[in-house]
């Protein structure tokens, strides 16, 4: 079973991702949801995800900083940045920090 962490301060985004994952993978995946970067880090410690989808712009700690801390806890976590920011510098920084990909919202089902 894969554990997937979803972190975004917009509930509609996490709800949609959760729905897509559950419909596509059923019992093969378990999800946990965070509404802030700090909560994502806390969940990463206890939930120990295999995969994480992180928004960049969240209250408190942003997704890039959260990714850095999460990968410090477990370098094997596959992190995908999910954002509305079409910013080359953000994308470059995300990849430098170890993100698997930089996905632009809205993300279609096939990308997940």
Which ranges hold each PLM region?
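Conserved sequence signature across two-component system core domains
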Residues: 7-8, 34, 52
């Amino acid at each position: 079973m894969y554990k997937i962490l979803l972190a975004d301060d917009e509930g509609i985004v996490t709800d949609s991702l959760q729905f897509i994952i559950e419909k596509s993978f059923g019992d093969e995946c378990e999800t946990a949801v965070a509404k802030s970067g700090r909560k994502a880090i806390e969940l990463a410690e206890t939930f120990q995800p295999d995969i994480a989808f992180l928004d960049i712009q969240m209250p408190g700690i942003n997704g890039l900083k959260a990714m850095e801390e999460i990968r410090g806890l477990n370098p094997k976590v596959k992190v995908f940045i999910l954002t509305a920011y079409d910013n080359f510098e953000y994308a470059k920084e995300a990849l430098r920090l170890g993100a698997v990909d930089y996905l632009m919202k809205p993300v279609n089902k096939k990308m997940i």
